[in-house]
Amino acid sequence: MSTLQITGGQVLTPELTVRTADVLADSETGEILAVGDTAAGDRTLDAEGCLVVPGLVNTHCHAAMTLLRGYADDKPLDRWLQEDIWPVEAELTPEDIRAGTRLGLVELLKNGVTAVGDMYFEVPEVAAAVEEAGIRARLGHGIVTVGKDEADARADFEEGLAVARELDGAADGRVRTALMPHSLTTADPDLIAEFVPRARDAGVPIHYHANETTDEVDPIVDERGVRPLEFADELGLLDEGDFIAHGVHVDETEIELLAERGVGVAHCPASNMKLASGIAPVQEFLDAGVTVGIGTDGPASNNDLDVVDEMRDAAMVGKLGADDAAAVAAPDIVNAATAGGAETLGFDAGRVEAGALADLAIVDLDAPHLTPSHDLVSHLAYAVRGSDVRHTVVGGEVIVEDREVRTLDAGAVKREAERHAAELVSRAEGD
């Protein structure tokens, strides 16, 4: 057994209280062994002046879209996708996707993210980047059948199911998978209905965009005579362990369906604001017992992957949407970014206690914007920045130490991504 002892810090407990304690983790099993007065570890990690919190979880992301950061802005979702994003994505190579994913993972890890839900293409390349970086992930192939004939549409679903089967459990269990049809309006419903039972047989959950904009909701209501999540239920898409992204335009019946079925929501406030998609009813989700996680969405619609910043956005816009300053309170948001996100992605993490996965972020409290320290839970929700994360630990392994990623050469990753981004845009624009 090889152990890591995190010493000298304060610890955020599962009850969201703070106490001074050491944390001992088993780097071989990847679990926390003890919190408190622990035995000495084989190696130590200094947390003096820091708060040890559960690793943050980004429940919905398209990490490789770092290559398109700043490429197309200030448009509503449908125009943004059809005029800008989909045409350039048609030119993506597997090498582009790996380079963009590696850049995204460096950004995530430096901001204290230990697990990510990622929907994109060329999933073996994404999984390889995940294995190299040392992060944890729930991955899937984004299935889009718009504009494809029946054979190509079916092939896209077959690819989505195949990679879910083949890659589940990769990277020593850090990679888990899901079947990921893009949405109810971009993936053929008949094929969804056909492939859902096959995904269930394979033991993988299902993740998709749902109720993101009124342009998505209204056609389903008009054509099907039911709300989108009622239609999703008819297709078999609402089962325990499944999770949706966005859930902006939902009614009470749909919220009740999510709660009854045990389906989580990846709440992406910054992307929803930037694309003017709307404000998700987060307090209503919480009141109904729906598990809520925090997501950044892709870095082309955010435009960063900072879950710390996303917590603040979620709290602020949640209060605005509810017209209630007490709504979406700091403890709710901290829980969503940690335990709620871990539950949404299906990882036994999100809490600093014995038996949980040793996925941790160590936040440096020595900053003017974190002084004084009346309430550290409040600080996590409203004042902490991603750059305040000093160390990131995944499965008892130190991945970021003193703000430097140990598993990837960040400088080389940035240079490689810059080159791939330039070449991608040049191909797409015919230069």
From Swiss-Prot:
It catalyses: S-adenosyl-L-homocysteine + H2O + H(+) = S-inosyl-L-homocysteine + NH4(+); S-methyl-5'-thioadenosine + H2O + H(+) = S-methyl-5'-thioinosine + NH4(+). Substrate binds at E89, H182, E212, D297. It comes from the Archaea. GO terms for molecular function: 5'-methylthioadenosine deaminase activity; metal ion binding; S-adenosylhomocysteine deaminase activity. The keyword Hydrolase applies. Its EC number is 3.5.4.28, 3.5.4.31. Zn(2+) binds at H60, H62, H209, D297. Pfam families: Amidohydro_1 (PF01979). Keywords: Hydrolase, Metal-binding, Zinc. CDD domains: ATZ_TRZ_like (cd01298). Catalyzes the deamination of 5-methylthioadenosine and S-adenosyl-L-homocysteine into 5-methylthioinosine and S-inosyl-L-homocysteine, respectively. Is also able to deaminate adenosine. Belongs to the metallo-dependent hydrolases superfamily. MTA/SAH deaminase family. This is 5-methylthioadenosine/S-adenosylhomocysteine deaminase. It comes from Natronomonas pharaonis (strain ATCC 35678 / DSM 2160 / CIP 103997 / JCM 8858 / NBRC 14720 / NCIMB 2260 / Gabara) (Halobacterium pharaonis).
